[in-house]
Amino acid sequence: MRREVFEDNYEAVYKYIRYLTNDQELTHDLLQETFYRFYHKNYTEYERTYLLKIARNLVYDHYRRKKIIGFFQLNSEPIAKEGLPEEIIERNAEIEKLYGALQKIKWNYREVVILRYIEEYSVKETAMILNCSEVKVKNNTARGLKVLRELLGGEKDV
């Protein structure tokens, strides 16, 4: 059971922590602590939701202790790997531009946009992870996307 939970959720939790920290070593430390805490609480439902909630709290706690504000920086490694070289370069430039814009928006908007559009969670799942209402998730998503569009010059594809 534990191995199955780990294998089913490792990648999603890893990516989430990595997006929040942009630090591979810290990501591995927090990932280990996330699964440790999860296993000691014996959650049986909504495993991924609880894992992400634990991970989020660990990231917050880490930066609160360090007194670091504005710590969000996405990994700038190229993501697009398929297509013609010109297309790959163009797509990677767009991704870096988007990540740069994400760094400039409020944390609560940033986190909702990451969960909804990068991690592809539903409104309900996002609300459970963030411990807030679905209405707040919808409002922050709309506001976050609006700010991103403004930062990216009104692009509709955000």
Model regions and ranges:
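Arg/Lys-rich amphipathic alpha helix in sigma70-family domain 2
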Residues: 56-74, 91
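Structural recognition of an alpha-helix C-terminal capping motif at a helix-to-coil junction
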Residues: 29-36, 45-57
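A short pre-motif secondary-structure segment
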Residues: 112-116
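A short, charge-rich alpha-helical start-of-domain segment used by transcription regulators
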Residues: 1-15, 19, 25-28, 104, ...
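DNA-recognition helix of helix-turn-helix
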Residues: 128-154
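Acidic, proline/glycine-rich intrinsically disordered inter-domain spacer in sigma factors
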Residues: 77-103
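Hydrophobic-face residues of short alpha-helical interaction/recognition segments
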Residues: 13, 17, 51, 55-63
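Residues within helix-turn-helix
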Residues: 25, 124, 135
